[in-house]
Amino acid sequence: MNKNVKPNNPMKVITGPDTRWSYANVWEPKSINGGTPKYSVSLIIPKSDTKTLTKIQAAIEAAYKEGEAKLKGNGKSVPPLTAIKTPLRDGDTERPDDPAYAGCYFVNANATSAPGIVDVDRNPILTRSEVYSGVYGRASITFYAFNSSGNRGIACGLNNLQKVRDGEPLGGKASAEADFATDEDDDFLD
């Protein structure tokens, strides 16, 4: 048996290379509202990447089927998939004022353990400045059902990341390289 062949997990997806990373908290876990600190990234997927979007839809459906008992909870029946929270969201309707999300869907993925981060040649990336909100890359993500404090749905876990290429940094902050790209001395006292 080939050791490199892994059993197929229908809830796991590897996104396409045109996926853009936003809100990339992949080096240090962050706590939201006093919750468990987590590593996270918003994965912006072009609507034209139908291959990735089809895989995500199938993985969400697989997570729904696998998690029916959890989703049912104390109720008598499982709520329909259309009635629960799912992680694939439309950037045009949910983030209409953010041009980075225009013409895209997005998925927020998180994990309590750090994701592995590699470059296009699968070498580990250790320099933090190489991974920022705005880069393009593939993401290994897994979908799962949850039922917590009355909230039921499908969530997305973050496994690993592969940076494919640089992109315009998101967040409106210029890089130090861009700020100091000119040799001119702009003396504000002149």
Model features per residue range: what roles?
Residues M1-F106:
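OB-fold ssDNA-binding interfaces and closely related basic DNA-contact patches used
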Residues S42-I44, N108-N110, Q162-V164:
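Residues in well-ordered beta-strands of folded domains
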